[in-house]
Amino acid sequence: MSNNPLEAVTQAVNSLVTALKLPDESAKANEVLGEMSFPQFSRLLPYRDYNQESGLFMNDTTMGFMLEAIPINGANESIVEALDHMLRTKLPRGVPFCIHLMSSQLVGDRIEYGLREFSWSGEQAERFNAITRAYYMNAAATQFPLPEGMNLPLTLRHYRVFFSYCSPSKKKSRADILEMENLVKIIRASLQGASITTQAVDAQAFIDIVGEMINHNPDSLYPKRRQLDPYSDLNYQCVEDSFDLKVRADYLTLGLRENGRNSTARILNFHLARNPEIAFLWNMADNYSNLLNPELSISCPFILTLTLVVEDQVKTHSEANLKYMDLEKKSKTSYAKWFPSVEKEAKEWGELRQRLGSGQSSVVSYFLNITAFCKDNNETALEVEQDILNSFRKNGFELISPRFNHMRNFLTCLPFMAGKGLFKQLKEAGVVQRAESFNVANLMPLVADNPLTPAGLLAPTYRNQLAFIDIFFRGMNNTNYNMAVCGTSGAGKTGLIQPLIRSVLDSGGFAVVFDMGDGYKSLCENMGGVYLDGETLRFNPFANITDIDQSAERVRDQLSVMASPNGNLDEVHEGLLLQAVRASWLAKKNKARIDDVVDFLKNARDNDQYVESPTIRSRLDEMIVLLDQYTANGTYGQYFNSDEPSLRDDAKMVVLELGGLEDRPSLLVAVMFSLIIYIENRMYRTPRNLKKLNVIDEGWRLLDFKNHKVGEFIEKGYRTARRHTGAYITITQNIVDFDSDKASSAARAAWGNSSYKIILKQSAKEFAKYNQLYPDQFLPLQRDMIGKFGAAKDQ
């Protein structure tokens, strides 16, 4: 090494100059990286922005709207005609319109919210609540546990329906926006005319909905909370950062990473191979869950999408004319001998051109596809494939798997993708079908079960819809909260009603049960209720009266039925009896007795006022004799003249066993009416926000009275209970006990004034006889369904 400092400096400078002359490798690497293309699924999506003022979505080259609809429970011809009219006269021609039916497994939040009033109490409450939640969560993740030998795909899902539409618009001009806003109003009004209620989907709801469609996690039951970023394009907000999509020949695989755990889902697509021979809108739901054959159901999450384009009327009319003239010409030559069907085809095209020419129909191109999601293993995928193909084939729909085209079909289930040019690709691939507008209206995936109420008794529907029963829910828009239940022994009546009683008690309300057979004794003990035998019941008709003007007629009716269960008292009898009731209460208030009523009647009979009225004196004598059995020294006096009635207002649950009174019908009806009046008075005297419930079990025995007064009494009580948040649940063995000429007036009144009617397993013989007598009461489908109901222990 040189000791000369100048030489060292010179060497360092030369090294720096040499380094500067070398090529810049880092710059070159950055250039190569810039030229590389990393595929991103979000770039395939056209979503960009949302205009809050207009409610429209501004996509890359299109502009559109999205609506969410409440699925309809069923359909009829008028609904189909309204939808057909919308297609023919309201939708712009040549622009795709999509209907999406989504079966979601993200029901965890709904289950927890719905069970909030069915929670356990006590030392082990937390443990039992966790067990209850886990039971339903496991059913949603897989399926409900069933008895050995019963293999039905019963699970929990939530069905949602969406409409999406977009049209080309690069500049997003004010004129385009106004035109689209008017179209939204027209479409929503048309759907409302078809009994389909809709609401607009905003940006937050959009990223939640599309995010669920795209990012399926088979291990998740809870929707992901997405925070809308107003400064980011919507397409990026719909796709998870860990999104990993792999395209296979026969399926797609979707990988995600959530909460430190990896998940992989398999995506399967199936589209319609050809037009079905026949289709009805009201039967479309049977394609994914058959009511009569529940084994033919699709239990995995799926999206059923119908993409349609109404073709230009002039072009299709010209096409029909040319086709008809060609076929009509061939039908008159020897060609028809070789192809006999040509005459039928000519006739069909001739009829079609007439309908097109008069505007009665339009030709619609459509693509029907179902996208299913399952765990990524071959065995599960094979089961899902067979379930889908068999379920649709049962109704005459032949589906095929789009080999090498699953990515294309998957994109069709997403909003606004068809309007970006995807529908054109489908037409070029030859997978688009054509049919008349009326036929396509029958293919719309709009029918699904109703979730009923947000909370209450968890009661899944036949089509696996997560549903709850809360008879007090005001959103049902029922005229009352009453329920009528009919089912044979072992049908599950008690198992249905006991949770409803629990829910009322858990909410702070009270329940009274008329029992015959100890069916509610165990529940009463578990809930800390009061169990009373009919033999030990003690009443006083005047005990709980606070306003005689309000209660006099009800007490009069009670005494009228007690005096004559067969209804032999007329208006004069009742007028005299009303005077006696009022006078007795005014004299002794709550200490009044039936003896005081009889004494008033005796004094009236001996009064000079009726000396010249033998008919009135005769009526007074009749009532004195009839009511004598209920006076303190009468046969049943011990039941109705107590200073301390058996029923106390502080009891939250009371079960009254009336089986011991069945062989004494006069006493039974008197006790029944005394109980109902007690319950009514308690309903009236308690806060209206408090739930009140009266269960009449074995109603066919307790309400079997031919007295029309009983029916009027029941009807009035059942009608007025709603104003005080009260409900009556009447239970019988057979529908004939409620709704037939043989039914008593009381039973018919209970049936007619019950908004909720629950029909369980019926006696096959009795139900067949009922259908012969009343053929219009049930549709054939309903008869078949009821006929297949089994015993509760076998479910």
Residue ranges and their predicted role:
Residues 1-443:
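Extended, folded cores of ATP/NTP-driven motor/assembly subunits in large transport
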Residues 192, 393, 505, 525, ...:
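Anion (oxyanion) recognition and catalysis
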